[in-house]
Amino acid sequence: MDIILLERIPRLGQMGDIVSVKDGYARNFLLPQGKALRANEANKKHFETQRAQLEARNLERKSEAQKIAEKLDGQSFIAVRSAGETGQLYGSVSTRDIAEIITDEGFSIGRNQIELNHPIKMIGLHTITLSLHPEVQISVVINVARSTSEAQRQAEGETLTSAEEIYNLQEEILEENQEELLVEEINDNDINSPHQEA
């Protein structure tokens, strides 16, 4: 199907370009979203009369996106999720989750603006690209951790998924437990031992 683009669309074309796309892509996405018109004579004339308004509206959206980008670019957001010892999440962090996290911080982001090739399934720092406008893209960091304290440690550069870290943490816990058991055993011996008289 031939269509007229009403805005710049990555890997497709610029505003005003007449391009050929698959029928389903046009019918299900581009036309309902108002990103394109069918390329017939009536729509070509309509586009030419509305071109100045469309360009002005596009410029306005771009400037709004740039204002948001200045505040949001490089920001870090924390996602607390349950994970196993190796850092494998029990679920995943999807575009919907990321959109909720960023929106909770006061920014209006839709899940369709998040470029994520696959869901996040490991704890760690993940750089995500946000497309605020076809011409404005920024990067944010999603810090996926088991707790906020772990997220802070990760932000400081500590890796929480390496075998050394896991075993060191387990050894520390074992040492603490052994110390507690020794203290309890000593206390029990003091209580249970009969007092010897001299």
UniProtKB/Swiss-Prot annotation:
InterPro entries: Ribosomal_bL9 (IPR000244), Ribosomal_bL9/RNase_H1_N (IPR009027), Ribosomal_bL9_bac/chp (IPR020594), Ribosomal_bL9_C (IPR020069), Ribosomal_bL9_C_sf (IPR036791), Ribosomal_bL9_N (IPR020070), Ribosomal_bL9_N_sf (IPR036935). The keyword Cytoplasm does not apply. Keywords: Ribonucleoprotein, Ribosomal protein, RNA-binding, rRNA-binding. PROSITE patterns: RIBOSOMAL_L9. One of its GO terms (cellular component) is ribonucleoprotein complex. GO terms for biological process: translation. One of its GO terms (molecular function) is structural constituent of ribosome. It comes from the Bacteria. The keyword RNA-binding applies. HAMAP family: Ribosomal_bL9 (MF_00503). Belongs to the bacterial ribosomal protein bL9 family. Binds to the 23S rRNA. NCBIfam families: L9. PANTHER family: 50S RIBOSOMAL PROTEIN L9. This is Large ribosomal subunit protein bL9. It comes from Bartonella tribocorum (strain CIP 105476 / IBS 506). The gene is rplI.
